[in-house]
Structures are given as structure tokens and as C-alpha cells.
Amino acid sequence: MATTEHPPPSRLRAWMLEGLSDMGKGHAPKGAQAEKEPVDEGQPWYRVMCLTGVDYFSTLGYQPGIAALAAGLLSPIATIVLVIVTLAGALPVYRRVAEESPHGQGSIAMLERLLTFWKGKLFVLTLLGFAATDFLITITLSAADASTHLVENPHLNSALHDKQMVITLTLVALLGAVFLKGFLEAIGVAFALVGVYLALNAVVVVSGLYHVVTEGHVVTDWTTALTAEHGNIFVMIGVALIVFPKLALGLSGFETGVAVMPHVKGDPGETEEKPKGRIRDTKKLLTTAAVIMSCFLITTSFITTLLIPEKEFEPGGEANGRALAFLAHEYLGNAFGTVYDVSTIAILWFAGASAMAGLLNLMPRYLPRYGMAPHWARAVRPMVIVFTLVAFLVTWIFDADVDAQGGAYATGVLVLISSAAIAVTIAARKAGQRNWFIGFAVISVVFLYTTVVNVIERPDGVKIGACFIAGIILISLLSRLLRAFELRVTSVTLDDMAERFVRDIASRKIRFIANEPDSRDKAEYRDKIEQIRQDNDLPEQEDFVFVEVTVTDPSEFEAGLTVRGQVMHNRYRVLTLESSSIPNALAALLLNVRDTTGCIPHIYFEWTEGTPFANFLRFFLFGQGEVAPVTREVLREAEPDRDHRPRVHTG
């Protein structure tokens, strides 16, 4: 490629762009530079579990209250349905996702392989829109909920009652600061928060179960009220199946669980292509998190339903949004209750950490590769700043209101889980695994039902998700438009025959003819040479090599280029290339030939028929169009020095 001198980067720029070369490419950089850069070897799976666990486990702060409001006395039964869906549905789905897509791209990567060209890109952008909805709302909703707990604390209410927006924005900014410091620090903080929070919840659960046992009448009162309200067990189960989608926030941790996979430490010596240790340990991570959460969901739903009066769950009630905190204060005293409050506020604030980690693993692996984000979007720290600013905007739009964001959050979670279920169903069918295919198909139907019910009840979630999708698609297409003339070939490799052709003509003036392959018969090449000679008034003795580019997938942006040489009809030398864009491939070849030979190559075109605008659209969408001027523009951007720029001739 073009070798242009650049001043050494500033310390701030170097710090901001640290890790740029290997983000989103799935492998470490090669060469001397790679040796200087520290390699993130990952963390043990149980520590990474805490990074996704701050999102997953923190829902205990509000899940029992949501279940009680949604299902009333049926809350424990509806929660059991949710746990069955978790362990028999979401868990096997995401264990398979971890196996099929072990680089943090989740089910989106699996579905991407099924669709090609622009329809595949638009489909991925739509799923990324829902992922952004899920992850960003996780950040803003959790921070807002933490600030709500803080503001509603009896000791702080008078001082903070009108400061919720400021507190929420401060918590989001602090979260961004942790990630600017680095992933290891985020995992360390998450490990401490989750450990303390689960221990405190275990104490509350044991205390609650003790009071259920010692106050035997509460069980009798509950079963009597259930029978009076619903009649028999079959009606209860039927109603529980109808209301359980309202409890879907309890499924929030799975997508982030596979999104943070790259941070799981693998076995010594394993490769990125076959990370068996990472896959095995991520399955442990998912299973352990699901089992822990299931135990807490059932026990907390049971004790809160039996021990807390129903009116306290209503808006304005003492247990509204803080059911377990209510029990902590009620049965373990205000000192323990205050410690529990602090732990809950801390984990709710940091719940956005797993979402931020998911965004940082997901977005840089797609958008820059599609040419739909700047090159620096592959680096971690600039993206942290971008996501933090977007979280500020979302918080401001929703006025830091937890309830207003709930619909969007649940919709994002359920759409991603449904897409994952469909992806593994297709994978099982392709692998010829009939039993798994049937099982995953049933799971897909369950999650699609849950999603539809949720959308009907909370249509605002789809509207907000649609805004994210529209925003991502619009920004992505604008970015692709602005980067249209970039040299987007990452490497050029010539086979032996191609290298021989280049060496041969380097002793004379290097002249290439850009040829659109048609029948590739002898007459095609003979007529093309004659036309180029006449158009450019070149003498008979001038030597030429043909260059032919076949467009593969024009929706792709960056890729390596392989150049193959062949002799056609025992006379005409032809270099053949495959690329997403003809002008980019030709420009990359010319710059490579210049750099390897030290000579300025010339390339000859004929004008393309059609209007400039129509030809630009053909180039933008299909990689073709008016090749000559676009090739020249790509060369101009890649090599500012006219004296060193390959020459483009058109006739």
C-alpha cells in the first residue's frame, strides 16, 4: 500500500487507540509490533461470569416486585415457569451459541452466515439495533434504578429528591470511566460486587424461609387464597403461562454471557480458530449463572409473596421496587438493611458493565468491517466514549424514568433470545441433528410467543427499538458513503505467475489494461489491445498485462486481495482478482506494484456508458459503475503525492 510519512502519535492518541489493530479481526497483529503489545490472556470463567452477572443477578433488585405485581398470588408459580424456560430453553440455546460463535459475536454471527449481500447486512444491522436497545437500555435503566434507590432512601430523600437526573448521569459517567481504565479493572469490580450481593441475598433468603417455616399460617393463607381466586391447579398453571412473559427481564443475562466470551481464559496453547477451552468454560459460566439465578428467582418470589402484604407492592408501597430490601429491613434490622441497600445500589449501577462489555465486543466486529463506522471504532476507548454519550442522550430523553425504559429493555432481550433460538435451530438442522432440531424449534416457538405477548402489552418497546435500528442503519449508510473512496484492501498477495508477470514488465514501462471479462476468447483480448492503442496513440511495441476483477460480495468493505496470473490463448498475460469493488482492487494492485518494483505503473480504461449519478450508485451498491474516475479517486486519497501516484489513462 501507499507508504506516507506520519508524525509520531501523541500519548493521548496512542492511549485512546490502544488495541486498534486487533479489535474486530479475530486475531492478533503480526510482526514486530505484536511483540510489543501486551496480550490479554483472559480471566477465569467464574470472574467473567461476574461481569455478565452484574446485569443478570442485579435484576433480583426489582424482579420479585415485578413478579408480584404481574402475577399476584401466582407469582411463585409464574416464576417456576420462567425458570423452566430459562433452564430448558435459554440455557441450551446459548450453550450452542457459545459453541458455534466463540468470538463474542453471539447469535448474530450465526445468522449473518445465512444471508449474503446487502440483505444480509441490513438483517445484521436490524439485529444490532435490537442489541443496542438491549445493552444501552441496560446501562441507562440500571443507573436510573440505582439512583431511584438512592433518592428514595429515607435518610437521603430530603436532600436528593429532585436530583435523580444528575445522579443517573453521574453513575453512567463513572461506568464509562471504569471502562476507559480497562477491562481487567471492570472484571475486578464486578467480581467484588457480585460476591457481596449474592452473599447478602442468600442471608435474606435464609431469613425469609426461616420466617415462612416458623410462621406456618402464611403458607396456609397463601394456598387458601390461591384456591379461592383460581379454583384448581390447572387454571393456576394456565394463568401462570399467560402472565410469565411479563417476567421476561429475568432472562437478561444470556446475550451478554456470550458477548463477553473473548475475556474467558482458554487452555494453554489453544488458537482463536479452535478455542476449545474457552467454549468449555463459557458453557460452565452460562450454566452456573442460570442455576444460581433460578434458585434465587424461585426462593425470592416465594418469600416475598408469602411475607409481604400485597398492598406494599403497589406504587407508593414500601416494597415497591425493593421487595428484598423491605424484607432485609423488616427481619434483619436497619443496619443490615442499609448494607443491603448500598450493595443493591452498587450492583445496579454497575449492571451496565456487562452491557458495555457486550457493546464493545459486538459493534466493532461488524460496523467497521462493513465500512459503516470509522476505522477508530475498532479501538475500545473511543467506543466507550461514544456509548457513554449515547447513554447520556437516552437518559435525558427518558428523564431517567425506570418504568419508561422497561418495555424497550424487555423487547430487546426477547428479540435477541428469539434470534438465537432460530439460529441454533437452523444450525442443528444443517448438522443433521434431528432431536436437537426439534427441541430448538419448540424453544423458538416459546420465545417467539413470549416476544409477541410482550410487544402487544408494551408496544413502546418496539417503537424505541425501531428508533435504534433506524439510527444505526442511517449512520451506517452515511459512514459507508463517506468512506466510499477509501483504499479498503487490507493486504495484497501475488501468486508465482503474477509475480513473474510484474517482474517482466518492470524492466520496461509498466502498463496494465483493465478488462471486464466477457467471453475471454482470443478476439476479446486482441480487440481490447487495439482499442487501447488507438485511444491513447501508443506504438505497436508497447507491452501490456490485462487485469480482470470479478466482483464477489459488493456489500463487504474490507478484505485481503489475492492476485493470480494466467496466460490466455498462449499469448495474453492476465492478472485475475476477486474483490467487493473493482476500483479498490485495481488501486490496491497498482500501489502494491509500485511499492514492490519502485516503478510508477500505468493503467488504461475505456469510459463506461451511463450518467455519473447512476454509475456512482452502481459503484456504491454493486462495486462496479464508472471504474476509471473512481480508481483515480481512490489512488488520490491513498497517495497524496502526484509524483508517486500510479497513472490512470482513459479513452
Predicted regions, residues:
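Membrane-interface "cap" regions at the ends of multi-pass membrane proteins
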Residues: M1-Y62, L111-R113, F117-L125
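Extracellular/periplasmic helix-exit of transmembrane alpha-helices
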Residues: V206-V219, G269-P275, T287-A323
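Transmembrane-helix boundary/entry motifs in multi-pass membrane transporters
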Residues: E37, V48, V97, S101-D134, ...
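Extracellular loop-to-transmembrane helix junctions
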Residues: P64-R113, K119-L125, T140-V172, V196, ...
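Loop-to-transmembrane helix boundary motifs in multi-pass membrane proteins
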Residues: F117-K121, H161-T170, K265-F296, P364-D399, ...
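Helix-loop-helix junctions that connect adjacent transmembrane segments
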Residues: G195, A199-S252
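Cytosolic C-terminal regulatory domains/tails of membrane transporters and channels
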Residues: M1-P38, L487-G651
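C-terminal membrane-solvent junction of multi-pass transporters and transport-like membrane proteins
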Residues: T223-T224, P374-M383, I417-V462, A484-D504
